Amino acid sequence: MQEHLIVSLDGKDYLVEPGTNLLQFIKSQDTFVPSICYNESLGPIQTCDTCTVEIDGKMERACSTTIDRPMIVNTQNDKVQASQKEALDRILEKHMLYCTVCDYNNGDCEIHNTMDQWGLEHQTYEYKEKPYEKDYGPFYRYDPNQCILCGRCVEVCQDVQVNETLTIDWERQQPRVIWDNDTSINDSSCVGCGQCATVCPCNAMLEVNMEGNAGYMTDLEPGSLAAMIDLTKKAEPGYGPLFAVSDSEAAMREERIEKTKTVCTYCGVGCSFDVWTKNREVLKVQPQHESPANKISSCVKGKFGWDYVDSDERLTKPLVRKNGQFEEVEWEEALSVVAENFNKVKGTHGSDGLAFISSSKATNEESYLMQKLARQVIGTNNVDNCSRYCQAPATKGLFRTVGHGGDSGSIEDLEIADMVVLIGTNTAEAHPVIASRIKRGHKLYNNTLNVFDIRKHEMAERADNFYQPKPGTDLVWLSAVTKYIIDEDLHDKAFINEWVNHFDEYYKSLAPYTMEFAEETTGISKDALIDFAHQVADAKSVSIAWAMGVTQQDIGSDTSTAISNLLLATGNYRKPGSGAYPLRGHNNVQGCSDMGSMPDQFPGYQKVTDDEIRAKFEREYGETLPKQVGKDNHQMMEGIHNGEIDSLYLYGEDTGIVDSNINFVQAALEKVGFLVVQDEFFTFTATYADVVLPASPSLEKTGTFTNTERRIQRLFQALEPKGDSKPDWQIIQAVAKAMGYDWNYTHPSQIMDEIARLTPLYSGVNYDRLEGYNSLQWPVAEDGTDEPILYLEGFNFEDKKANFYPLTFDNFFKVNEEYDLHVNNGRLLEHFHEGNMTYKVPGLEYKVPNAFVEVSPELAEDRGIHEGAEIKLISETGEVELVAHVTDRVKGKEIYIPLNNNAMAHGDHGAINLLTNSDVDKDTDTPSYKRTSCRMEVKTRRGKSPLNPTNFRVNKQRQPQYSVRVQDKWKREDYTFPGSQVDR
């Protein structure tokens, strides 16, 4: 194959790699060619025809041309200019230029910029208004009269987000973008990701927060705005002066609209984007092509879920309980109360009488300081974080087998994998951008998708194969498949011989896991499992992703271990598109654990029981540190009940709602002698507090998050803290100072420098290396070299070999006659966990106003209930009252309750954890949230559906297709390729 080809561009020769896109090459040479429909994140769409150039004497679109031979390319001759002028005129026939009073006059309008740069002064064709009104959804709106039919929105919806809602109806006399089978935005299958607005080159698709808000004259009434547009156009003899005026107005906007790079504060994907703010209002969230985890992708929460930041419900002053009532106080008094009571408890109960719960919503720097406060200032290892509730078992399984507690590759590996296996993860709703990558690989590249889950969610519906095992039995089918692969000599012997220990011992341990035992135990047929085993063995690369459906079981650690065993047996580590992907639930649950907010580990998973490691931290901290392992979250609650713990300091976590068996937890919160809650809002847990400290959300601070793929990214402060609230790092430092320890940090970068000194995983991390959209995936060497794919140089053990880990199974879960229903639970796309943030976003609350319970059609028939029935669910630990949604997403006696209910603080009774019990994973103390059974009492047999009828889950009809179907445009009688027109 040739290394380079000669391309003559406007008379100058260049050496170009074969396969290079011609338009990108032209742009790389600083040669201007208009390209309004082209977006580097989307690739060629071929709808606008503006990028036409002459190639070897023939007029062709540059965007869809691959350099596969020597070429002579001309971008400047008369024919090219005439063709481009014709294409630009056709665009202005569809789009009225009124830039100065346009909401999108922000310097990014590609129509404005293209016309200006091309030098177009007058349009040939008069603008034609279309017979369509604007269409508004809760988050964005569509203006057909400004739409140029470039198709970017369709491309991103169909082939990037892969929600498959948008199409262009090319059959109409005047084509337009349509939703589903031609319904409104609000009544469609649209999930509100907003990517259509992200990629729109003009003001046709626009965030509703931008409309009337962005410019100096954009808030005019429609009639006045129309008059202003007419006046402006009549006053200017050509577009040049008009553009000059609008450019001046755009520059004025830049003075009052701040654009700040940040990282999303919701799930663990780690989407980064620019957030546009005016005063304290978030106008727009704009992902960038260089965003490392998400590119241009977003979900409804990341794109539109920011209203909570300026909510009137934000805490803005410290609160201290006095005579049973909370009173606002100044920081000095609040900190004095905290220090006095910490010292008091330490004096009466010792250092281990205090406990600390860190937040997976906070930054790495803040999580680091929380464990430092516990260990250096107080002298206890009683510190933990919410990874205990979800991800600790996955980390345990990976530490056992491969040595690092994190994803073995990157998100992009899930897109390029030959096969993706999803186990116990509702990825489309819990990790939407990752789901989009998987859906894209499945749709465009024909990658195989296998889903194992007890619930038929979207990914299950899309899968090539969907398997529904009995609850809690994943370890069995995983081990049976691994055994079958080895029995049939399908395992990767060369990989095992070179890279894995303990094969013989492990193979012997698989003896009980016959296909017959697996079929009987899991309910999946032997034939289906054998077929799956062959698929795994034959695939070039396999990636397995899992989440809380696996980890929140009595044997979550063992099942996670079984996943890694299967990957090792088939050689699916150490190469692109392969490996283990425990999908982290929170924006920084990975980082919070990395930072040592755990009872047994310092930052970087360095054990507190290791004398050498502990001595290193003692030298840094100047104190003797405890060597005994502390209490985890679960043990803290027990410690309060039995009198061992009398003070608890937690931040960024609503423990009284999110922990399992919350009747038990709430009793502990009531009993503990001194409780400090640090949060953005007065949470349910705060009702038990003695002191409440007002904290700042991510937009009001600087720091770093580490996402599910071990990617460390900086977030930059976009807003000043509201009222007297403070970033968590400042509050924790102030608590330490009140206790007599002056840390003297003036910026989070200093904290990261300290982390890097002490933590080999982060040794090369500093803020300079994370400037802008730069990121690093740990482990990071001192020179800044990171590892997007783990284990290329060997596994994280002394001998560089992984370990097979034998497992046993005797954990049969069965409901009994009294509690005959199995309760599953998890996230909804629109809300994040209990909803403390998302219920303060009107559009999200509108789409899903309350939690509910999914009931199967067969169970509904058996109990004589219908949509909207009010039912009471009763378990051994508590009861809830919910409204039923009847759906085939669940089957039989499986029911599903979303997590999104924080309403107990308002007197409601829908929180899932009133039903869950205190059972835990035997190795990590992670609550067995998924191992819950209950019985049902019917209060009313039918009623109003708990879902808004506009919700995408309610009988919506997606319209899958590939790209924008531009060929249908080309077939229209009124279409002629401009290049052909000038060739005549």
Swiss-Prot record:
Region of interest called Formate dehydrogenase, as start-end residue ranges on this chain: 252-984
Sites where the protein binds [4Fe-4S] cluster 2: C147, C150, C153, C200
Domain 4Fe-4S Mo/W bis-MGD-type: 257-313
InterPro entries to which the protein is assigned, alphabetical: 2Fe-2S_ferredoxin-like_sf, 2Fe-2S_ferredoxin-type, 4Fe4S_Fe-S-bd, 4Fe4S_Fe_S_CS, Asp_de-COase-like_dom_sf, Formate_Dh-H_N, Formate_DH_asu, MoPterin_dinucl-bd_dom
Biological process (GO), any one: respiratory electron transport chain
Cofactor binding, per record: Binds 1 [2Fe-2S] cluster.
Domain 4Fe-4S ferredoxin-type, residue spans: 138-167, 181-211
Catalytic activity: formate + NAD(+) = CO2 + NADH
Cofactor(s) it depends on: [2Fe-2S] cluster; [4Fe-4S] cluster; Mo-bis(molybdopterin guanine dinucleotide)
Binding positions for [4Fe-4S] cluster 3 per the UniProt entry: C157, C190, C193, C196
Record protein name field: Putative formate dehydrogenase SSP0601
Native source species: Staphylococcus saprophyticus subsp. saprophyticus (strain ATCC 15305 / DSM 20229 / NCIMB 8711 / NCTC 7292 / S-41)
